Amino acid sequence: NVHCWDDQQANNPDSDPAWRGDFKGLIEKLDYIKALGFSAIWITPVVTNASGYDYHGYHAFDFSTVDVRYESDDVKYQDLIDAAHEKGMKIIQDIVINHTGNFGEATLAPMFTKEYNTLKDLESVNCMVPIPDSDFAKTFPDYDSLAPGYQYQARLNIMKDTKALDSGDHDTENNYHHYKDLSWESPTVQTGQIAGDCVDVNTENPKVAEYLNTVYGDYINMGVDAFRMDTEKHVSRLTLNQFYFPSWLKTGGKNFYVFGEVCTRVSEFWNHNIPAISAPFYTWAETDSKYINALGDD
């Protein structure tokens, strides 16, 4: 999510790109996609994101709601799922549990609300307004007058309790990891941030897991057929096995399909000799899976 040099050369605005598409357009192309031989469609995350360049869905602002920019007055997410099923096709929903965007999250860190009259208003970050009487608004009453860099630090100050701009206590429920590291490959890859706009969620927190499982369970109940998990390597496999996979399989059935991104930026078999963040650690076949076998045949 950057304003690239070629954008500037082409005089492209620093606003919302038109690459997102919507459910209505996808429904109109289902016959074409099926004719190509595809039986399933893997879509980007549908959850509400902040604004502007958050076009791809990977910077959650509210996990529990579908981004209105994908919808039309007459076509919602459920309509896409139903339309695909009517044609014998499946919907694979891309999901994220590792992180949110840096404007907080409606349940984990309620800091902002969106104020807009039309979808065009969502093109600008100016639609993001601090929630009155929130911890964020009380701590930074002059947020709008801060320079962009300090605005970013103010948001992290609340989400990760960085104490960079004030010494108060924030995120007292530990919904986020408070490590300051920013790295894709390091021993803190599962507790630090992978990027400035991806604030690491404390996926080991049972309350966080309960919230995320409720949210994604609702999508399964809508009829989503499978999950593709983004940044899977950045969540401990032990955490996934303990808190997340059992819940999704209980909701979706023993055969509910999940696959994920275990992306490394090295050519080594073992990622920096750390098995816990290496691809094989996430792909070993297990013939004796207690949580799957306990589900029975439903």
Residue ranges and their predicted role:
Residues 1, 42-53, 95-104, 231-236, ...:
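Short, solvent-exposed turn/loop segments enriched in Gly/Ser/Thr/Pro and often Arg
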Residues 1-90, 105, 192-198:
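N-terminal structural segment of carbohydrate-active enzymes
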Residues 19-32, 201-221:
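Short, acidic/polar
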Residues 52-64, 98-184, 273-280:
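Aromatic- and acidic-residue-enriched segments that line the glycan-binding/catalytic groove
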Residues 80-88, 98-99, 111, 132, ...:
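Active-site-proximal helices and loops of the catalytic beta/alpha 8
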Residues 192-203, 237-245:
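Active-site cleft segment of glycoside hydrolase catalytic domains centered on the general acid/base Glu
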